[in-house]
Amino acid sequence: MSQDLWSFCLSRLEHELPPQQFNTWIKTLQADEEKAGASVALRLVAPSRFVLQWVRERYLRRIGELGAEFHGAPIEIELVLPAAGAARPAARPVIGSGPVAGPAPAPTPSQAPAATAAAPAVVTRPAEPESSIVTASDLAYEKTRLNADFTFDTLVTGRANDLARAAAMQVAQNPGTSYNPLFVYGGVGLGKTHLVHAIGNAVYRHNPRAVIRYVHVEDYYADVVRAYQQKSFDAFKRYYRSLDLLLIDDIQFFNNKNRTQEEFFHAFNALTEARKQIVITCDTYPKDIQGLEDRLISRFDWGLTVQIEPPELEMRVAILQKKAEALRVDLHDDVAFLIAKNLRSNVRELEGALNKVVAFARFHGRGITLEVAKDALKDLLNAHNRQLTIEHIQKTVADYYKIKVADMHSKKRTRVIARPRQVAMWLAKDLTPMSLPAIGEAFGGRDHTTVMHACRTIAELRLGDHQLNHDVHVLTQVLRG
């Protein structure tokens, strides 16, 4: 009976979920008919605690609904880990069409704790606390320092990050052979850290025996200092050179730390020579990092460098909807568009604004309406709109390029004047809600087609002109505060 029920659930979920989610989370579950109790209609065995927690939080409720549909009444579902000595289900492909090579997970030496679902809308906890059992697999995952919530499934994608995501998925599928190192750069709060954790989690799911470490540069620096103080550099070197995957965040903080750069240089060489994967994040293009040795910068160019840009409107709306889903709140499109239209800088700012709206609504006992959102974000929206005026953009760009603000309105076409003016037009279009005709009017009464041409020119030049791209990036960060 359990197999028939689970086959029904699998069939329905395969049509409801994206293939990536279905193959990663649902297809790895196995129905255990022998050990299902009289009160339990379906007992599912998850291959690891990581998968168990993820399924319980995101899919168990839906499985319960399908079970009730199959039986014609609410049922109880039990979600457990393999019993001691039991063989785990084989690992399945996670991303793309091809699996990542790696040994199957080792059996988990633990008594399986259960998570149960009674009626479709209710999830109950096991009598025994799940935290009372710690397996070797749990300890191995904890040592990676990965965030289990940061996966490719939970990453909202759009034009701003589609190239970076595609490259990251290639690296996760073929660590050490595709794009080594992978260098991801972009402004604060755009999802770089999420992306590197997603790589680590994908590799770990395929190969739990892989030695993975996520480390922020400041923690790496602290490890170097500790090794120096304790005279334990041999152990330090052995550890970092034993990794299969090194994910290092915010490399720009290596600036002027000579001993740390020296150690990382040798670790980098050892890992790449052994075909081990390195993924690096930074807030700027490699050649623009201040205080970093040229030999390191040149090695960053060995692999692939990709940029994550600020999310476009549609992507910002999708990010808000995803966050609302995680918070289990109903977010209407008009509220999402209000937030997304006015807050453009990064994902953290968007999520912070949504959290503020939700808290405001709950405190006042009101639903999340457009009026409530405007009240909750009144100060933030007013400050944002005051700061990002076309006049403010013109002054900031003029100061940056050391030209006069009057040049923004003039008819001069020399390169030293025309290019900054085009940059200012591009920023005005990207950072303000002003229409193209209104922007043109603010730049000396120019036609909207001139603004369109300027924006198109800057967008195209940014693809190949690293200095211009850096200028635009810096100006954007300055203007957004």
Swiss-Prot record:
One GO cellular component, as annotated: cytoplasm
Pfam families in the record: Bac_DnaA (PF00308), Bac_DnaA_C (PF08299), DnaA_N (PF11638)
InterPro entries documented for this protein: AAA+_ATPase, Chromosome_initiator_DnaA, Chromosome_initiator_DnaA-like, Chromosome_initiator_DnaA_CS, DnaA_C, DnaA_dom, DnaA_N_dom, DnaA_N_sf
Protein's UniProt keywords contain Metal-binding: no
Subcellular location: Cytoplasm
Subunit structure: Oligomerizes as a right-handed, spiral filament on DNA at oriC.
UniProt function note: Plays an essential role in the initiation and regulation of chromosomal replication. ATP-DnaA binds to the origin of replication (oriC) to initiate formation of the DNA replication initiation complex once per cell cycle. Binds the DnaA box (a 9 base pair repeat at the origin) and separates the double-stranded (ds)DNA. Forms a right-handed helical filament on oriC DNA; dsDNA binds to the exterior of the filament while single-stranded (ss)DNA is stabiized in the filament's interior.
Protein known as: Chromosomal replication initiator protein DnaA
